[in-house]
Structures are given as C-alpha cells and as structure tokens.
C-alpha cells in the first residue's frame, strides 16, 4: 500500500484538504484516502501498474463515498473502465447524505 501512496502523492501537484487523513497523521496522504483520489482525479488506465495495485489493495465496495462514487465524478470517466471495475468486484454505490439518509444502488444491472 505504501507504493500506491507514493505514486499518487508524486503524481499530484496539489492535494485537496478533503483527501487528507483526518486520523492521527493529520495532513498526510494515507492509504485510507488514496483510492478515492485515484478514482476522482486520475486518468484511470486499466493497464497501468497503479490500477493493478488499487484493484488488489483497495476496498472497491467501501461504504460511504465509494470508489464508484468518486469515479462517476471523474472528468475522464470512461464506461469501458467502469465495466472492468465491475468485473473486478465493484458492485455498489453506497452513500449517506448530510442528513443521514442512506442511498444504495446496485450497478451491475445497469451496464452491459
């Protein structure tokens, strides 16, 4: 996981505060948030070493703002990448709003 953090940190000239670790290492990029940064800001290349590391080590079905949620906000969104993510087990959009309402959608049936 340290390799993922190093690659992402070295590739970004600016990291928004929302992606900084809010735990004991406040102000540092951590493995807890690097997956979200990757899917939100990077041009996701399914043949890259970084993509393979993220698929192997990150929780693709994390509750809250999932990697799927982040990827749908990516300006370089590509449906073929989404299909590959679904193939690797990403299966949900699971989020809560500021009032605590829970939203969940199962995406596998939406893309063929």
Swiss-Prot record:
Family: Belongs to the orthopoxviruses B25 protein family.
Name listed for the protein in its UniProt record: Truncated ankyrin repeat protein B25
Organism: Vaccinia virus (strain Western Reserve)
Lineage summary: Viruses, Varidnaviria, Bamfordvirae, Nucleocytoviricota, Pokkesviricetes
